């Protein structure tokens, strides 16, 4: 569990045979080999740091994370940090600083570009935030630029790289949180819809869309308080909604052509489900529940 921004989230990542995670008790990052399951090894020292939103920069043998550094009688400082993985005790270095808060550091598939969102007091990320993009090398980042939100009138959510290295994100520039594609020079809507393809960013790693393949986005959106799922054909800008009994959905991810999410409804306890491209819904895991007659529930 991460303590960054107090609400935490995205406290682990997996690369090859290793799990990297933030330990709740001391907020240090540990490495755990998944095959041997031996004792986890701390790779960050004891200190004033907290970490979240971990990603692996394999090309440069390091982690990139949001770091929150606490000092007595001072406001905590947030920045993007690198943590070297080729030492027994990793060094923590600032990668990007200056804003009050950071989230969603994300590497392009070729690991040459890094994007992130940032915001500053007094705004919350759903009030006003910026999407930034920079080139990345062993020595750091170069040519950072704001590609969305520079006017202070946008809220950005979940930047995400497509399999073919195009950058997508969610913006509320039209007063609806819609998905956009950055084509290298400007931001274009993937689909214009009077619906919200995002949620307030209370925790790191929140996700409402992912790529089934280079041409298809699996997504969640909310309309009049009810959540829906579907697939967007990027080429034709067509949305295919999925008919299901669920009205509450969150935490979307895709794997091997399927959409996975946590879903529930007023009369259905939340469970992990998967949906294939033929809109077949499968329950993956449902917790044990008490049988309650729906007539006893307020509708």
Explain the meaning of each model-derived region.
Residues 14-16, 57-59, 109-110, 162-164, ...:
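Residue-level detector of Asp-centered blade-edge/turn motifs that repeat once per structural unit
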Residues 18-34, 38-41, 51-56, 60-63:
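Hydrophobic or amphipathic alpha-helical targeting/insertion segments
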Residues 39-45, 92-96, 142-148, 187-194, ...:
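Beta-propeller fold detector
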Residues 33-37, 84-88, 136-139, 182-185, ...:
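Short loop/turn segments that connect beta-strands within beta-propeller blades
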Residues 2-6, 21-30, 45-51, 66-80, ...:
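A flexible loop/linker signature enriched in serine peptidases of the S9 family
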Residues 19, 63, 114, 167-168, ...:
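Hydrophobic beta-strand positions that form the internal "hydrophobic ladder"
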Residues 6-14, 203-212:
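Signature of short aromatic-glycine-proline-rich micro-motifs recurring in repeat-based ectodomains
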Residues 52, 64-67, 73, 103-104, ...:
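Non-catalytic accessory segments flanking enzyme active sites
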């Amino acid at each position: 569990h991460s303590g960054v921004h107090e609400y935490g989230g995205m406290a682990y990542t997996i690369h090859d045979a290793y799990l990297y995670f933030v330990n709740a008790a001391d907020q240090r990052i540990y490495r755990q080999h998944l095959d041997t399951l031996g004792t986890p090894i701390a790779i960050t020292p004891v200190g004033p740091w907290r970490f979240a939103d971990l990603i692996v920069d394999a090309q440069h043998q390091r982690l990139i994370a949001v770091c929150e550094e606490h000092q007595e009688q001072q406001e905590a400082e947030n920045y993007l940090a690198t943590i070297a993985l080729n030492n027994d005790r990793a060094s923590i270095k600032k990668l990007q600083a200056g804003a009050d808060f950071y989230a969603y550091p994300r590497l392009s598939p070729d690991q040459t570009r890094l994007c992130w969102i940032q915001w500053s007091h007094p705004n919350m990320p759903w009030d006003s935030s910026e999407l930034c993009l920079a080139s990345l090398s062993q020595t750091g980042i170069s040519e950072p630029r704001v590609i969305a939100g520079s006017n202070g009138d946008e809220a950005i959510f979940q930047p995400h790289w497509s399999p073919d290295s195009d950058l997508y994100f969610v913006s509320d520039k039209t007063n609806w949180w819609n998905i956009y594609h950055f084509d290298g020079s400007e931001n274009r809507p993937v689909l214009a819809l009077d619906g919200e393809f995002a949620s307030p960013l209370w925790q790191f790693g929140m996700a409402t869309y992912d790529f089934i393949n280079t041409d298809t986005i699996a997504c969640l959106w909310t309309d009049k308080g009810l959540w829906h799922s579907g697939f967007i054909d990027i080429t034709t800008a067509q949305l295919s909604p999925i008919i299901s009994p669920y009205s509450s959905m969150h935490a979307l991810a895709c794997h091997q052509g399927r959409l996975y999410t946590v879903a529930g409804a007023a009369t259905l306890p939340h469970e992990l489900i998967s949906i294939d491209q033929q809109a077949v819904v499968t329950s993956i895991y449902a917790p044990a529940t008490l049988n309650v007659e729906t007539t006893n529930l307020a509708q």
